[in-house]
Amino acid sequence: ATPDHWHALNAIDAMEAGADLYLQKPISVDVVESQAILAAARKLGRVVQIGTQRRSTPHLVEARDRFIREGKLGKIALVEIYCYYHMRFRGNPPDVDPPKHLDWDMYVGPAPMRPYCDMPWRALMEFSNGIVGDMCIHMLDMVRWMMGLGWPKRISSSGGIFVDKQSKANTSDTQTVTFDYDDLAIVWQHRSWGAPPDPKYPWGATFYGDRGTLKASVMSYDFIPQGKGEPVHKDVEYELEQYPEDKTEPRLERHVAPAIRRHMLDLLAAIEKRGRPVADVEEGAISTACCILGNIAAQLGRTLTWDPAKWQVVGDEEANRLLRRPYRQPWVHPEPAKYA
């Protein structure tokens, strides 16, 4: 429940204190933080579930099993993942004194100090990784889970602030990231302007196979066969009769309530059995780091080749220096080596 730049310190402190965790995505704001969180969880024997609850969404589990695992898409060579919601902050509020109830120095914490203004923290790269860190991780993690994928071999990206240049937000309003798995490309795109190509899928994933296409989101899925066969549509499964409190729970997104319940139950079962949950911290580390590497690739303007064993970009010291954000004193960046 904290901004992204606090996740690593909070998570590691909690694990050091003996706690198992539910940790929101992205698990960190830089790559080395992800590596340190994973190392700490393994060394300390903690169960850590990440808030990538598509892994627990009933209709997405069905889509994975029915169409991908059964081979009905054939050879999948391209997956498009996307978010076309106009979610980038558009305002330009003045810098003001922080509210009296807010300790602004503590809020900023290890991030670079900046003046307070009334705008969402996700609008600022000092505290986040923008829309890529917020939304691409959901879609990339879903695709990796549905297809059983680990790390990509290469990551490239381009984008920037192309349309809304007046806002104080310093996150991209347009960006494409390609995650290259040799014979498979996963391509992310976001635009915080214009219309989505498919209004029914403004946020989701489209799997292209040589035998069919699958569109999937938290609201539905659609399977479109190539040639013979009938298309299949499935909407999200609500559980309002079984859980009538969903109708009145404040701020609850009803369409994700079934997934949240299953995700929490999965975590509790993993804690009881001391096993790995469906969205284990290692999966969260991979999905988080990949998205951060996408932003680094865009910043440097070149493709990054990743070595997962070393947690390093191959042959690119400039990129490797960007895997770790400098911490503002007195906070100290967590070190993976401490938990080796």
Positions of predicted regions on the chain:
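Short, hinge-like loop/turn segments at secondary-structure boundaries
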Residues: A40-K43, R66-R69, V96-P98
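Contiguous beta-strand/loop segments that form the cofactor/metal-binding neighborhood of enzyme cores
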Residues: V61-E62, K72-K75, E80, Y84-E282, ...
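Beta-strand-loop-alpha-helix segment that lines the small-molecule cofactor/substrate pocket
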Residues: P3-D4, A8-S56, G71
